[in-house]
Amino acid sequence: MSNASLLTAFILMGLPHAPALDAPLFGVFLVVYVLTVLGNLLILLVIRVDSHLHTTMYYFLTNLSFIDMWFSTVTVPKLLMTLVFPSGRAISFHSCMAQLYFFHFLGGTECFLYRVMSCDRYLAISYPLRYTSMMTGRSCTLLATSTWLSGSLHSAVQAILTFHLPYCGPNWIQHYLCDAPPILKLACADTSAIETVIFVTVGIVASGCFVLIVLSYVSIVCSILRIRTSEGKHRAFQTCASHCIVVLCFFGPGLFIYLRPGSRKAVDGVVAVFYTVLTPLLNPVVYTLRNKEVKKALLKLKDKVAHSQSK
């Protein structure tokens, strides 16, 4: 970080909206945030207590739930503060740096994790007899660890490139969170080279993972079509459909914001809300409503709680 950085704080401009919508938006985002945290905590609890869910797929799902819970926590509380407190828009320089780092750290890790999960589904469906020998506990741990390390490296690049520049004013960030593109507009130096590097790195990570995921699912579909029983086909399609829905909702808005030419604040703001506020909620919703094993485990947990309370 340069010594020429004179700013000690930034002001988040928040979402572009009419002031009369402050209270309704606060209520909606608060409800979504609480549901996101509770929903993902519930998935973690159910998988933890039900031994039938101690499988590779659910091991990666616990990582995903943990990421989504904290991904939402990094952005939504500050967004809520900007809606109800005049002073809530202010964020210190170092807090802004931390928010950018963890935003990209968790987002990048989730991106890599989706790639790993697609490989896991491919191996499970295409090589069912060899699957357990290939996806051992050690292999799963190494894969999960690699996603977290890759996300950390990706985020460190974003943070270092963004905050080594001098910032001497103005300090109004045209966003509701600290992200590289709006922050770079405030730098007191030429940012064209850094913007290009960030664009390329985000593009390689997001587009690369997405393309590899698509290729995995093309191979999965080909493998499913070779399954002889209709019940086997239906179960395989159902399992993969849940993952595909979450993947599309995660990558779609992200690619739209970072890789499209030009920028419109209102459109970017709405898409960013979907990406940072609503997408983390989709994980518990999709994986509980569409997954029979998780629903069965939830019912068992409910019965256990009811039985313990009746004693």
From Swiss-Prot:
The keyword Endoplasmic reticulum does not apply. Its main location: membrane. It is a multi-pass membrane protein. It comes from Homo sapiens (Human). Glycans are attached at residue 3. Residues 1-23, 74-98, 160-196, 258-268 are extracellular. Disulfide bonds join 96-188. Gene3D superfamilies: Rhodopsin 7-helix transmembrane proteins (1.20.1070.10). GO terms for biological process: detection of chemical stimulus involved in sensory perception of smell. Pfam families: 7tm_4 (PF13853). Odorant receptor. Residues 45-52, 120-138, 217-236, 290-311 are cytoplasmic. This is Olfactory receptor 10G8. GO terms for cellular component: plasma membrane.
